[in-house]
Amino acid sequence: EKGFAEARIIKVLKQSPLAAEARCDHYWICSKLQTLSYEEQLKEKEKQVVDAFQRIGGFTDFTINGVRSAENKYNYRNKMEFTFSPHRWILESEPEGVDSSFALGLHIPGRYDKILDINTCHIQPDIGNKILGIAREVCLKNLDLKPYDPKTNIGFLRYLMLRFGVKTNQLMVNIVTAYDDINKLSPLIDTLLKEVPEITSMVNNVNTRKADVAFGEFENLIFGNSFIEEKIGNLKFEISANSFFQTNTYQGKVLYDEVLKIAGLNGDEIVYDLYCGTGSIALYL
């Protein structure tokens, strides 16, 4: 885009006083901002909002309050979607001959067909990384558990979706497949339920369409309930595999408390919650 440019660091000649050490091994693909101190990240976020109002909206007279910082900067996300793929993105740092026929991880930005194989993702709870490792190990040992290829429409495993009740300690595993075959999933199901007793819900969404999405035309309940529970304030929500819910429970409460304070409701009003997902904002009010 005119007036904007992207660059890649080749060599650091002098470290910026604003720099921070990234926790993630793949920060330069997933989250480049990790190399910037958290305080500076908040300032940059505020600048983006100001820019949107000024440059895009054309506003000149407005006030932007500071960004509310997060208490939990890592291990906060209550939903993760990892993609199975036969097209693994090979890193420059990896040796030649690395097997590229299996990956379980996240999409390379701008590439629908390449997946970065991930062992540890620091924005999800630690138990999610345990599940990620077990799933990868089981799939590599069982030839029937082939990753789905959207180019050829061949393969079985599409997504591994995890949902965490960070306030309830409930855990859902949703295995999304390209067709219905619970027996083929048995090695993965049995191993996960044996080695991760914290799992309270396991489902299998079946997506036979070529559309590369993590929800299916129908769902098989494998273990426990078809939902997990999560709490925001005094409210408890039932969240299914395909529900939309605020992905940061901690900051969700901060946001809802701010809305509640600004709205100043007395109980006589009618609140319309449009495009609401589970309706958590209006219920909170």
Feature-to-residue mapping (PLM):
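Accessory RNA-recognition modules of RNA-modification enzymes
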Residues: 1-285
